Design a protein with these regions (language model features):
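Short, conserved micro-motifs enriched in small and acidic residues
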Residues: 31-43, 51, 71, 132-135, ...
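Short beta-strand segments
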Residues: 4-6, 65-67, 94-97, 117-119, ...
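Phosphate-handling active-site elements
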Residues: 27-29, 49-63, 87-90, 145-155, ...
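Acidic/histidine-rich catalytic neighborhood of metal-dependent amide-processing enzymes
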Residues: 39-113
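Acidic-glycine-rich active-site phosphate/pyrophosphate-binding loop
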Residues: 12-26, 91, 106-117, 282
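Metal-dependent amide/peptide-bond hydrolase catalytic core
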Residues: 115-321
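Structural motif
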Residues: 1, 30, 63, 92-95, ...
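Active-site metal-coordination/substrate-binding segment of hydrolases
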Residues: 2-63
Length: 321
């Protein structure tokens, strides 16, 4: 049984905290601090039980898989996957302790994050028709991305188990230009695709790149052939979808005494364990994702107790009788 989590956290810059985000503070039955909800509470619970794991004779070994740089696109776990891929024996199942309120999660969307650099042709703004405005052409591509997002919202495919039941596209960061009287020769923006498990995000990315090449660059090259678009993948990970009827899911539900399961809006490393290694994976951990990444992030003592009880039940179920 593999217990998995990530050790990194998101930054606190620009957030107004009431306490030191990197000193754990207890107040009103809650523990405040960066990463308390996402997902260091789970890691702390697991590590606190390592002595018992080591001293107890188990029917199956317990593997601890803690990664880094998950928050920037599941980057650090790649080295772990490379290592596990060549092992003769792999874990039979994986529990990722992201905050789910200690409920079983069997699915989440995948993600493809892309950076687009638009190369224009600068000139004085009084001669703007002689230049190639990188911001203008970036804007046209952003509008096209928004159009694709609208088409997905109308035509699907759909998965009713999600709060947003279709693949989404979203532009989140834009930058460009140096002065109002200069036609900008550079604009950069980042967009992401959050896709359903069964959808291939590369198909959408191909549509976006083809629109840029076939429609926008042709117009740009009438003035300067060195202008154009550059696409860079920032991060990508697959979606997760685990059959709720398999023995592993039933086993975990039994330990929790809760037969419910769901799909969530946030991602995890679970799809990578499932897709690359073929390890049945689910997400289940203490805390609430609504508290993650915010100022005054916290986890309740009640959730930690539930998480600890679950790990104790897991250990007890694996004890060699």
């Amino acid at each position: 049984v593999m217990l998995s989590g990530h050790t990194d956290v998101v930054p606190v810059s620009g957030q107004d905290w009431d306490t030191d985000p990197f000193s754990l503070t207890e107040s009103s039955d809650k523990l405040y601090g960066r990463g308390s909800a996402d997902m260091k509470g789970f890691i702390a619970l697991v590590l606190s039980r390592v002595p018992e794991m080591v001293s107890t004779e188990l029917t199956k070994p317990i593997h601890l898989a803690f990664s880094y740089d998950e928050e920037i696109g599941c980057v650090g776990v790649q080295r772990m996957l490379d290592l596990l891929e060549h092992q003769p024996i792999k874990p039979s199942c994986c529990i990722i302790g992201e905050p789910t309120g200690m409920e079983v999660v069997i699915g989440h969307k995948g993600k493809l994050a892309t950076r687009v650099k638009v190369r224009g042709h600068a000139c004085h703004s009084g001669q703007s028709p002689l230049g190639v405005n990188a911001i203008d052409f970036a804007s046209e591509l952003i509008v096209y991305i928004r159009k694709l997002a609208h088409e997905k919202s109308q035509n699907g495919p759909f998965d009713k188990d999600y709060e947003v039941p279709y693949t989404t596209l979203h532009t989140g960061v834009v930058g460009g230009g140096t002065a109002l009287n200069i036609v900008p020769n550079l604009c950069q923006f980042d967009f992401e695709i959050r896709h359903l498990y069964e959808e291939d995000p590369q198909h959408l990315l191909d549509q976006i790149e083809n629109f840029a090449r076939d429609h926008l660059e042709n117009e740009m090259h009438l003035i300067d052939s060195d202008t154009g678009f550059d696409f860079e993948t920032l991060a990508t990970y697959p979606g997760l979808l685990t059959d709720p009827g398999i023995e592993f899911v039933t086993y975990v539900k039994g330990l929790l005494d809760n037969n419910a399961h769901s799909k969530v809006i946030f991602g995890s490393e679970g799809g990578l364990f499932q897709k690359r290694l073929g390890i049945p994976t689910l997400v289940c951990g203490p805390g609430n994702i609504d508290q993650a990444h915010k100022a005054n992030e916290y986890i309740s003592l009640e959730q930690l107790e539930k998480g600890g009880n679950f790990l104790d039940c897991l250990l007890e179920s694996l004890v060699l009788s």
